[in-house]
């Protein structure tokens, strides 16, 4: 969309959140509220995005990418004042769309409709509105018939005006040239002593300019988030949207009430999500995989046909047709090739496990390279840390480690080798070798343990 720009209001302090974090940085479905709005703008191909910052500027600015321009509002003197700071940056821009950084539930299709109406009617301004049964605290849209008159804020409205149910969402399209002139005519003469952006509509009306409205059917898009309770309510709406989307895309979700999927997750058709599954970050799950129950995956990749149950995974890669869990813990740097089995009470960290290898139960594998078709017996651990440095363990293809083997890194187990149960291996084992390390078993006859009387 040439000659368009978006201006996102994000300068407010968010006092009711009672947080050191700026309001628009609180997350919804795994992303900051502000990022939801930015992503929505970019999905409708608006080429420029400007964010007006004030409180918490440094924290917010540090999270923005190079595509986002920052406009600073040093003093928060109202929405009109915020736009006054942005207008000088609108070089070669014919129209702007103004949004609020604390309204993360706005949808791309709504913005497209708003922009379409604005262009079709060659309007000076087009407002996004919504109808609430209880619009308490929200600015009202005043009309004469279908003709827009003005917006009145709750604190400045008469008792009769407060009965109006159509409200101002705070999202607008403006003709930049006309907005620039109208801003010269607004003053802070209101109950708050601020420059209201909404006062430009009265200026437009007096000048006979075209003002249009578009009423969204989804009132959730108008929800501004000012408290933790409102954030929780918005989280529920976002979660239901995400769940509905993936079910429409061919994903089976056994119990939507107990399933949580963040916005950055990608799922393929015929994935099955069991109850109490939580998928976070950039997690990707391929077709026919079954996740859960009671599984949390963050920034993980799961291959086709794998089964992952009662597992916590973070920044792990799981190949195709693997079996993981129950009660496995996959830490960052874990890479499992196809057909790997990781069983109960197994922890893996920063390790590569080759195709067809098995770690069935009660093991810790850290900083290791494990080959193909390896069997790691119950209770086997890699001793990879000396209190200062981490060391690597290498286990070659087809090795068989007996139960309760301790591998003192750095150490290498050769291809096809076997370790005896209970061995502590601290030296490299050649290929096709049996390695046993045990102290001599002693029997003390006629020994009876002293008992306290």
UniProtKB/Swiss-Prot annotation:
<keyword id="KW-0808">Transferase</keyword>
<feature type="binding site">
    <location>
        <position position="331"/>
    </location>
    <ligand>
        <name>UDP-N-acetyl-alpha-D-glucosamine</name>
    </ligand>
</feature>
<keyword id="KW-0961">Cell wall biogenesis/degradation</keyword>
<dbReference type="GO" id="GO:0000902">
    <property type="term" value="P:cell morphogenesis"/>
</dbReference>
<dbReference type="GO" id="GO:0016020">
    <property type="term" value="C:membrane"/>
</dbReference>
<feature type="binding site">
    <location>
        <begin position="384"/>
        <end position="385"/>
    </location>
    <ligand>
        <name>acetyl-CoA</name>
    </ligand>
</feature>
<feature type="region of interest" description="Linker">
    <location>
        <begin position="229"/>
        <end position="249"/>
    </location>
</feature>
<feature type="binding site">
    <location>
        <position position="375"/>
    </location>
    <ligand>
        <name>UDP-N-acetyl-alpha-D-glucosamine</name>
    </ligand>
</feature>
<dbReference type="InterPro" id="IPR011004">
    <property type="entry name" value="Trimer_LpxA-like_sf"/>
</dbReference>
<comment type="similarity">
    <text>In the N-terminal section; belongs to the N-acetylglucosamine-1-phosphate uridyltransferase family.</text>
</comment>
<dbReference type="InterPro" id="IPR050065">
    <property type="entry name" value="GlmU-like"/>
</dbReference>
<feature type="binding site">
    <location>
        <position position="73"/>
    </location>
    <ligand>
        <name>UDP-N-acetyl-alpha-D-glucosamine</name>
    </ligand>
</feature>
<feature type="binding site">
    <location>
        <position position="226"/>
    </location>
    <ligand>
        <name>Mg(2+)</name>
    </ligand>
</feature>
<dbReference type="InterPro" id="IPR029044">
    <property type="entry name" value="Nucleotide-diphossugar_trans"/>
</dbReference>
<feature type="binding site">
    <location>
        <position position="378"/>
    </location>
    <ligand>
        <name>acetyl-CoA</name>
    </ligand>
</feature>
<dbReference type="GO" id="GO:0071555">
    <property type="term" value="P:cell wall organization"/>
</dbReference>
<feature type="binding site">
    <location>
        <position position="421"/>
    </location>
    <ligand>
        <name>acetyl-CoA</name>
    </ligand>
</feature>
<feature type="binding site">
    <location>
        <position position="153"/>
    </location>
    <ligand>
        <name>UDP-N-acetyl-alpha-D-glucosamine</name>
    </ligand>
</feature>
<comment type="pathway">
    <text>Nucleotide-sugar biosynthesis; UDP-N-acetyl-alpha-D-glucosamine biosynthesis; N-acetyl-alpha-D-glucosamine 1-phosphate from alpha-D-glucosamine 6-phosphate (route II): step 2/2.</text>
</comment>
<dbReference type="Pfam" id="PF14602">
    <property type="entry name" value="Hexapep_2"/>
</dbReference>
<feature type="binding site">
    <location>
        <position position="168"/>
    </location>
    <ligand>
        <name>UDP-N-acetyl-alpha-D-glucosamine</name>
    </ligand>
</feature>
<comment type="subunit">
    <text>Homotrimer.</text>
</comment>
<dbReference type="GO" id="GO:0005737">
    <property type="term" value="C:cytoplasm"/>
</dbReference>
<dbReference type="GO" id="GO:0000287">
    <property type="term" value="F:magnesium ion binding"/>
</dbReference>
<protein>
    <recommendedName>
        <fullName>Bifunctional protein GlmU</fullName>
        <ecNumber>2.7.7.23</ecNumber>
        <ecNumber>2.3.1.157</ecNumber>
    </recommendedName>
</protein>
<keyword id="KW-0677">Repeat</keyword>
<feature type="binding site">
    <location>
        <position position="102"/>
    </location>
    <ligand>
        <name>Mg(2+)</name>
    </ligand>
</feature>
<comment type="function">
    <text>Catalyzes the last two sequential reactions in the de novo biosynthetic pathway for UDP-N-acetylglucosamine (UDP-GlcNAc). The C-terminal domain catalyzes the transfer of acetyl group from acetyl coenzyme A to glucosamine-1-phosphate (GlcN-1-P) to produce N-acetylglucosamine-1-phosphate (GlcNAc-1-P), which is converted into UDP-GlcNAc by the transfer of uridine 5-monophosphate (from uridine 5-triphosphate), a reaction catalyzed by the N-terminal domain.</text>
</comment>
<dbReference type="GO" id="GO:0006048">
    <property type="term" value="P:UDP-N-acetylglucosamine biosynthetic process"/>
</dbReference>
<feature type="region of interest" description="N-acetyltransferase">
    <location>
        <begin position="250"/>
        <end position="453"/>
    </location>
</feature>
<dbReference type="GO" id="GO:0008360">
    <property type="term" value="P:regulation of cell shape"/>
</dbReference>
<keyword id="KW-0133">Cell shape</keyword>
<keyword id="KW-0012">Acyltransferase</keyword>
<feature type="region of interest" description="Pyrophosphorylase">
    <location>
        <begin position="1"/>
        <end position="228"/>
    </location>
</feature>
<feature type="binding site">
    <location>
        <position position="403"/>
    </location>
    <ligand>
        <name>acetyl-CoA</name>
    </ligand>
</feature>
<keyword id="KW-0479">Metal-binding</keyword>
<keyword id="KW-0548">Nucleotidyltransferase</keyword>
<dbReference type="Pfam" id="PF12804">
    <property type="entry name" value="NTP_transf_3"/>
</dbReference>
<feature type="binding site">
    <location>
        <position position="226"/>
    </location>
    <ligand>
        <name>UDP-N-acetyl-alpha-D-glucosamine</name>
    </ligand>
</feature>
<dbReference type="InterPro" id="IPR038009">
    <property type="entry name" value="GlmU_C_LbH"/>
</dbReference>
<dbReference type="InterPro" id="IPR005882">
    <property type="entry name" value="Bifunctional_GlmU"/>
</dbReference>
<dbReference type="GO" id="GO:0019134">
    <property type="term" value="F:glucosamine-1-phosphate N-acetyltransferase activity"/>
</dbReference>
């Amino acid at each position: 969309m040439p000659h368009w720009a978006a201006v996102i209001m994000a300068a407010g302090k968010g006092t009711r959140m009672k947080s050191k974090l700026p309001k628009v940085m609180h997350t919804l479905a795994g992303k900051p509220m502000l990022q939801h709005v930015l992503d929505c703008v970019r999905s409708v191909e608006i080429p420029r995005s400007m964010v007006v910052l004030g409180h918490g500027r440094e924290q917010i600015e540090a999270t923005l990418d190079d595509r986002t321009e920052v406009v600073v509002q040093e003093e928060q003197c109202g929405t009109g004042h915020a736009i006054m700071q942005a207008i000088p940056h609108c070089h070669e821009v014919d129209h702007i769309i103004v949004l609020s950084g604390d309204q993360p539930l706005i949808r791309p299709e709504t913005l497209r409709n708003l922009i379409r109406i604005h262009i079709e009617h060659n309007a000076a301004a087009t407002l996004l509105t919504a109808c609430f049964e209880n619009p308490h605290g929200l600015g009202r849209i005043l009309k004469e018939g279908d003709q827009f008159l003005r917006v009145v804020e709750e604190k400045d409205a008469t008792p009769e005006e407060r009965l109006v149910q159509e409200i101002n969402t705070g999202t607008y399209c403006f003709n930049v040239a006309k907005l620039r002139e109208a801003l010269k005519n607004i003053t802070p003469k209101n109950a708050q002593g601020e420059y209201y952006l909404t006062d430009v509509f009265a200026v437009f009306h007096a000048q006979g300019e075209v003002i249009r409205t578009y009423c969204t059917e989804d009132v959730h898009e108008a929800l501004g988030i000012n408290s933790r309770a409102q954030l929780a309510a918005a989280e529920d709406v976002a979660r239901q949207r995400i769940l509905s989307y993936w079910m429409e895309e061919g994903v089976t979700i056994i119990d939507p009430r107990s399933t949580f999927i963040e916005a950055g997750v990608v799922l393929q058709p015929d994935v099955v999500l069991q109850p109490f599954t939580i998928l976070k970050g950039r997690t990707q799950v391929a077709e026919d995989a079954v996740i859960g129950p009671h599984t949390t995956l963050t920034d993980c990749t799961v291959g086709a046909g794998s089964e992952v149950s009662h597992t916590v995974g973070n920044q792990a890669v799981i190949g195709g047709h693997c079996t993981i869990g129950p009660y496995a813990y996959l830490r960052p740097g874990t890479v499992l090739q196809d057909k790997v089995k990781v069983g109960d009470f197994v922890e893996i960290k920063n390790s590569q496990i080759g195709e067809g290898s098995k770690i069935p139960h009660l093991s810790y594998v850290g900083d290791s390279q494990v080959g193909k078709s390896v069997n790691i017996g119950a209770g086997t651990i890699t001793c990879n840390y000396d209190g200062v440095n981490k060391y690597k363990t290498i286990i070659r293809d087809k090795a068989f480690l007996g139960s309760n083997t301790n591998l003192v890194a750095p150490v290498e187990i050769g291809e096809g080798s076997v370790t005896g149960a209970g061995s502590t291996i601290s030296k490299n084992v050649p290929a096709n070798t049996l390695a046993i390390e045990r102290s001599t078993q002693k029997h003390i006859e006629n020994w009876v343990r002293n008992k306290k009387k």
